[in-house]
Structures are given as C-alpha cells and as structure tokens.
Regions:
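Active-site-adjacent substructure of cysteine-protease-like catalytic cores
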Residues: 12, 26-54, 85-140
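Alpha-helical structural motif
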Residues: 19, 61-65, 88, 116, ...
Length: 221
C-alpha cells in the first residue's frame, strides 16, 4: 500500500511546514498562499514550566499556515492525541485505505534517518504514505530531511509516537477563483494595524537579551 504523494522541500520549511505544503499539493491545491497571513515572532521569557529557550519560543508559523491552508486551499487539518500505538496504527490504515496520508509526531530519538537518532529527544513530524506489511514498517515522507522515502519500523513509531494529523479536502468551501490582490490587502492591513509588529519586535529584543546573558548550550540539548 503506497500513495503517490510527492514531498515539497524548501530550505526555510520546518518539518510541519513541509507536511502541510506536501498535502496541499497532494490535494491539487498548490501551497503558495498558506504562509500569507504569517508575520511574527513569539517568545515568552517567563513561560510557566519552560526552562529552555526552545520551550519559550512559540512556533507561530505552523498555526498561521494551518489557518491559511484551510482558508485559501480548503485543506482541513485535525490534530489528535494518540491513545495508544494500536489505535494510531488503525487510524493510519483507515486513512491510507481512503487514499489520504497521515501526519504523525515522532520523537527524533526514535527516527532512524534523523541526525538526532538515539542522541536527542526533539519534536518531529513525518508523513505516512504507505505500509510495508512484510517488514512491519511504515513508508514515510520527511521533506525536512530529504526528498526521498523512508521506512519507519513499527517498533520505532511505537516508542516515539504522541499525536497525529488527519487531512481532509473540504468540499463545503467556496471554490471560486481567489482574488490575490484582495488577499494581499487583507493580510497586509491585519498585520500592520493590530499591533502585531510592535509585539513581535519587543519579543525579538527580549529573546536577544536573554540569549546574550543566559544561554547554556549543554542544557538546551
């Protein structure tokens, strides 16, 4: 079982960005507008329970691109916690039978092709596009790593899973041609006049100040 999804890989993409762009293209709705609403940098110096810089950064790219992915490309995403490995496996099989890949969270410590494999616990996401039943493995795309396909042993997913992402082409959305000028106008003014720029700039200054005084690379990794 293998779906014909082609990875979308860009140097500036996070792992989630790559998955979302890949799915937009898979549903024949090229991803070009999914970042249009994003302009931001979010950092909470005193975030409760966070003791590393990575935990204090808020990854707004994923949130904004998901909103725009639905609004402009009509691709809905549902982020779900996996109760256990068996239920996750059944969800993957069901979605693949319906010709839709599934995004899965995978701790990089258990991702064999990742540089952090067996070294560091880092949040990561891959896209399951098929099954290799003979080897009890999942066939995955990981645009963040390369444009190739990877086989993920079931034992690795069982140790490193947490949540999954379901994708759906929303037929209820208005499919009329989009007005690019109107979209640009809307997003420019929403970014410029709701105070987002000033907030982002203040967060950048706070992050730079904290980083210059408190960075401990060993603790961060």
């Amino acid at each position: 079982m293998l779906l014909a999804a082609a990875p979308v890989r860009r140097e500036y993409f996070s792992c989630i960005d790559g998955l979302l762009a890949t799915m937009a293209n898979y549903f024949s709705s090229p991803y070009g507008l999914m970042f249009i609403g994003y302009m931001g940098f979010e950092y909470l110096s005193d975030k409760p329970g966070a003791d590393t810089f990575g935990e204090k950064l808020l990854y707004g790219v994923g949130r904004y691109s998901r909103d725009a992915l639905h609004k402009y490309h009509h691709v809905k995403t549902s982020w779900c916690d996996a109760e256990n490995y068996r239920s996750l496996h059944n969800t993957i099989v069901h979605s693949l039978l319906n010709q839709v890949p599934v995004g899965v969270y995978l701790d990089s410590f258990y991702c064999p092709w990742n540089l952090a494999y067996q070294r560091f616990h880092i949040n990561h996401y891959v896209l399951v596009i098929g099954l290799d039943m003979g080897n009890e493995a999942y066939i995955c795309l990981d645009p963040y790593a390369s444009a190739g396909k990877y086989k993920l042993p079931g034992s690795c997913l069982q140790k490193g899973f947490r949540e999954y992402i379901l994708f759906e082409k929303d037929p209820s959305e208005n499919q009329e041609p989009l007005s690019l000028c109107g979209i640009l106008h809307e997003n420019y003014y929403s970014n410029a006049y709701i105070g987002r720029f000033e907030k982002n700039y203040s967060a950048i200054l706070q992050f730079a100040d904290d980083l210059s005084h408190n960075i401990d690379i060993a603790h961060e990794t």
